[in-house]
Design a protein with these regions (language model features):
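A short core secondary-structure module
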Residues: 146, 150-198
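Short glycine/proline-enriched turns and hinge-like loops at secondary-structure junctions
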Residues: 61-63, 131-134, 159-164, 178-182, ...
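Amphipathic, small/basic residue-rich leader segments at the start of a protein or domain
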Residues: 1-87, 94, 98, 103-111, ...
């Protein structure tokens, strides 16, 4: 397949170049230039946004058709990003495609689809089992012209990436509602005043630079 050919010609041969870059202390939290070079090649080959079933934005593949391609990409740590198919961007783009306003799509979805920015999803919290959203303690308060967001998140994947510009943040908007209807999500630009990226956290001893799992 075209994807396998691309992997053989461009992805596997450049893995060492990627690791040589991030294994240097000075460049550890910067993006290896080879990634942007390979993303341009993947775009030209129309091997781009393969995960999105909507043909308007992606390749128009079903989950059944995409699954073996995801398996092939999974053979290399760097592959999914090269084809703009890496988490958490994939899930965040799907949310924006389905539920984003026209303005949100223009500002955030368009550059995500182009692969020029990255994004993060802030759900996990330090004091509760956050995979169950009913435990979330962060709050989102609707005010006249904006929202007041309060919370402490960690293991927010990709928030350390220098290209990360937007966070989808989960919090509670109505503590009096049914426990499965208390939660909402808001878009929070990472440069918003009050957003503090504290430190990278490790998983099994690895910090996953240059993307990271941030507190």
């Amino acid at each position: 397949s075209r994807l396998m050919d691309f992997m053989e010609k461009f992805v596997y041969p450049n893995e060492q170049k990627y690791y040589q870059h991030i294994n240097k202390d000075k460049s550890r939290w910067s993006i290896p230039p080879i990634m942007e070079e390979l993303k341009i090649k993947a775009k030209k080959e129309n091997l781009w946004n393969l995960f999105l079933p909507e043909s308007k934005y992606g390749a128009g593949l079903s989950n059944l058709e995409y699954a073996p391609l995801a398996e092939i990409m999974g053979r290399s740590f760097i592959a999914s990003e090269i084809f703009n198919c890496s988490a958490p961007d994939t899930g965040n783009m799907e949310v924006l495609v389905r539920y984003g306003s026209d303005k949100q799509k223009e500002k955030w979805l368009a550059p995500l689809l182009e692969g020029t920015i990255r994004s993060a999803f802030a759900m996990t919290e330090p004091d509760v089992a956050s995979s169950d959203a009913t435990n979330i303690q962060s709050t989102i308060e609707s005010r006249k012209n904006d929202y007041l967001v309060n919370g402490h998140k960690w293991w927010t994947s990709c928030a350390m990436d220098p290209r990360c510009k937007i966070i989808i943040f989960m919090g509670k908007t109505d503590a009096e509602a049914h426990k499965y209807a208390q939660q909402s999500m808001v878009l929070v630009p990472i440069d918003t005043k009050g957003v503090d990226v504290v430190r990278p956290l490790s998983v099994f001893g690895y910090d996953d630079a240059p993307h990271g799992h941030a507190e």
